[in-house]
C-alpha cells in the first residue's frame, strides 16, 4: 500500500509542479501596479531597466518605477517577479550570474534573455524552448490562466507583424461573444486586464513556465539568436515561428 501511495504522489507531482508555476505567475500579476500609461520609447526602456536590480542572492523588482510601460516589458517583469518570489522562499536557487543575465539590459532584439523576450515573433516561446524552461503550444483548449501568450493580431510574423505579449487569464462569454481575458500593459492605460473578442486574434502562441531552474543555462546559449534578430527586417511565418519554438506546425 505504501508503494502505491508513493507511485500516486510521483504521478501527480509533475502536474502540481507545473500548476504551481502558473499560480506563481498569477500571484506576480496580482502584485503589479495598475495604469501608468502605455509608451514605447527609450525613456520607457530605461525605466524598465531601473525597475530591476540584482542583490546578493535575488532580484529586486520595483514595477512602479517602470511606468509608463509596454507589453513585453510588463510580462517580463511578471516573469522576474515570479522567479524572485520562488528564490525568496527557497523553491528556486539561481546564482547571482544567472540573475544578472536575466535582468533587463540594453540589448537588441534576439540578444540575451531580455533581447529574446522583447523580439518580434516568438520571443518568449523561443527563449523557453532554447533553455527548456517550459513548453510552447497553440491549443486554446490546453491553455490555463498564468500561461504567457503572444498574440498575433494578423497572420504575419516578423517585420510586418502586429503582436501583443500578455498573460493569459481565460476565455469567457461576453454578451454572447467568445472573448479572451488577459493582463499586460495595454494601450492607452498601461498595466491592467483587457478583454477582446477571440475572433480578433489571428494566431496565438502559448508558453508555460515549468522548469525555471533551467534559466541557469542562459550563459551557455549563443549571445544572439539569429532568427529573432532577423525579424526586425524580414518577414517570417507562423509555421516557421512554431518550428523554431518546438511546436508542431498547426494546419
Predicted segments, located by residue:
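N-terminal capping segments
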Residues: 17-118, 236-251
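Hydrophobic h-region of N-terminal signal peptides that target proteins for export
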Residues: 9-17
